[in-house]
């Protein structure tokens, strides 16, 4: 295989040759009249309709002239004719070029096009004998010459860091990834439509703030040179939205970036997209209905169903994770290759291409299950051979390492073949204290039946010694934080179907109103789906005196932490209101079957390369 530098040099030489002929391979403009996938689908629809109704006018007929543009993703040289696959965001189409049609000079240029080049094509549609919708090239224009080769399917996509750091390569090679981000865009568009239809006004509030507020989080700090003072990137949208409620904007929402200078995890990114919405004269009950209606609508729009599956492996993910290495091809120890060559050869034949014709229409779960069966069989044959005392292998031998690798592949394939069904039709409501009490009683095997009736000191002891949460409870944790650790570690991960957890401890949400029936709690909900919080919401505190007392207590006497302008705004009078926040990234993770927040953010934060 040629190294990358050699391939780059070859492409640069082709560029120089084109320019020497007076060809400019970096055009300013080209105007296609339709997409590649659109042209292919339309011709296919015409062809299929003609089989049953010769008079049908559905689609584009053979012989229709079209102009398309896209990236070359496949190139097959047949001598005096060339077949290329051209692809854009709408899909792909096969294009066919003949020396007889283009002439010697143009055909020679066409033959030297490279994978990943952008070209514009004019020609006529036709169906091949094999029934493949195609375009016969009559004229072509090089629009953008690629000076680097595309990544090899197995090598370029197997490196997760390359996928995140060079997302453009991921999008070029992986249709599943592109689909995720197109659907994310559709989700955000549907959210906006939902709120506009309900009479909400979309607003924009400051990203740089003199005092970060609305959440307990570490902010990023920046300096405003002209004003000569520090500013903070916002950690929440809330306080400016409440100013707008004071100003008479009764229904408002914003979709924007928040920034928190905290840790990275599969669920956390320092820069994330947040939706916040507020409705005057509503409360937390009002906002629960809003969240449920919104999520159902978006799910039906983006996924087409109220049932969502997790995790959702894609064909590309299966190819990347396993591919040709699923059975250790190229590194099988000699003894195993000789002894089990037949089984390995047959198995590889089943696994060469997950997206080949035999697997083309299968669901990813079915592909994983099929691969699991194949690899399990090979492992079983080898294991039976060893168990029969036919042969033994030394510890650390290549043979044992290979067998251990097979066992790991079997286990991962088994996980990929499992479905977790999230039913968005069923929404529950559970009180926070009830959930915690029941879980503690269950885990302690009845030793602690009434968590909230024992002393704070005893709660800490039980959490550490009985519930085994010592690693999650810091020495300085207050009592409500100890209970919070119990909820986050033992309860939240079990809430798969949508669950509104209500009446949280008042210390957790200082900007919410107290519950009339239990003054130790607030009128708050956390909407949990698939084991993580998707949306908090609550009845907003509109009493300026009560709000000042809570915020002063929270600030601990540090006056600079108080947002006096916000408190003054409340003193001008704010209507009762309900508010919600929904993490767009987590919502997309849930709806699109992604296990990491980085898989729904185009360019997630990574440590810069040195």
What are these regions (language model features)?
Residues 3, 12-21, 27-286, 294-296, ...:
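Class II aminoacyl-tRNA synthetase-like tRNA-binding/catalytic domains
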Residues 42-52, 300-305, 438-445:
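Short regulatory "switch" loops immediately downstream of catalytic or recognition motifs
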Residues 197-202, 300-309:
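Surface-exposed helix-capping loop/turn segments at secondary-structure junctions
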Residues 206-299, 309-419, 426-610:
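A translation/RNA-centric and nucleic-acid-associated enzymatic feature enriched
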């Amino acid at each position: 295989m040629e190294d990358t530098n050699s391939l780059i040099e070859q492409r640069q030489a082709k560029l120089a040759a084109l320019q020497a002929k007076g060809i400019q391979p970096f055009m300013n403009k080209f105007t296609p009249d339709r997409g590649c996938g659109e042209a292919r689908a339309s011709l296919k629809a015409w062809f299929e309709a003609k089989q049953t109704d010769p008079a049908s006018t559905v689609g584009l007929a053979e012989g229709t002239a079209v102009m398309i543009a896209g990236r070359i993703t496949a190139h097959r040289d047949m001598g005096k004719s060339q077949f290329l696959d051209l692809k854009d965001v709408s899909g792909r189409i096969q294009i066919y070029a003949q020396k007889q049609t283009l002439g010697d000079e143009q055909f020679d240029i066409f033959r030297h096009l490279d994978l990943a080049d952008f070209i514009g094509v004019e020609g006529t549609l036709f169906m091949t004998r094999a029934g493949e919708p195609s375009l016969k090239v009559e004229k072509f224009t090089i629009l953008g010459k690629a000076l680097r080769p595309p990544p090899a399917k197995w090598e370029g996509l197997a490196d997760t860091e390359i996928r995140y750091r060079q997302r453009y390569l991921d999008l070029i090679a992986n249709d599943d990834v592109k689909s995720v981000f197109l659907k994310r865009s559709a989700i955000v568009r549907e959210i906006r439509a939902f709120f506009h239809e309900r009479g909400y006004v979309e607003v924009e509030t400051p990203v740089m703030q003199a005092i970060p507020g609305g959440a307990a989080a570490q902010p990023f700090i920046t300096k405003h040179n002209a004003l000569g003072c520090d500013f903070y990137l916002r950690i929440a949208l809330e306080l400016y939205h409440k100013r707008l409620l004071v100003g008479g904007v009764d229904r408002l929402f914003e979709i924007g970036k928040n920034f928190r200078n905290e840790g990275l995890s599969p669920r956390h990114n320092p820069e994330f997209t947040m939706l916040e919405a507020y409705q005057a004269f509503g409360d937390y009950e009002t906002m629960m209905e809003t969240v449920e209606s919104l999520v159902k609508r978006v799910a039906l729009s983006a996924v087409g169903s109220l049932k969502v599956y997790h995790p959702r492996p894609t064909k590309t993910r299966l190819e990347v994770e396993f591919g040709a290495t699923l059975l250790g091809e190229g590194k099988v120890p000699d003894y195993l290759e000789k002894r089990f060559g037949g089984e390995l050869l047959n198995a590889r034949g089943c696994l060469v291409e997950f997206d080949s014709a035999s697997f083309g229409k299968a669901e990813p779960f079915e592909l994983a299950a099929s691969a699991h069966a194949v690899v399990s069989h090979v492992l079983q044959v080898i294991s039976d051979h060893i168990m029969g005392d036919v042969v033994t292998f030394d510890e650390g031998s290549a043979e044992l390492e290979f067998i251990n690798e097979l066992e790991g592949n079997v286990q991962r394939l088994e996980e990929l073949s499992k479905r977790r069904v999230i039913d968005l039709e069923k929404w529950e409501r559970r009180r926070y204290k009830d959930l915690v009490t029941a879980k503690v009683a269950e885990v302690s095997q009845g030793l602690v039946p009434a968590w909230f009736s024992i002393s704070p000191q005893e709660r800490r002891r039980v959490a550490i010694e009985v519930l085994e949460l010592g690693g999650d409870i810091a020495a300085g944790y207050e009592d409500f934080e100890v209970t919070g650790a119990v909820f986050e570690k033992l309860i939240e991960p079990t809430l798969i179907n949508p669950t509104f957890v209500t009446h949280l401890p008042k210390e957790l949400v200082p900007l919410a109103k107290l519950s009339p029936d239990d003054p130790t709690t607030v009128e708050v909900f956390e909407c949990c789906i698939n084991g993580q919080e998707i949306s908090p919401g609550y009845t907003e505190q509109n009493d300026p005196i009560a709000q000042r007392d809570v915020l002063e207590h929270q600030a601990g006497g540090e006056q600079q932490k108080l947002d006096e302008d916000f408190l003054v705004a409340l003193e001008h009078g704010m209507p009762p209101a309900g508010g919600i926040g929904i993490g767009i990234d987590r919502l997309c993770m849930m709806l699109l079957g992604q296990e990491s927040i980085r898989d729904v953010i185009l360019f997630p934060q990574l440590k810069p390369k040195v």
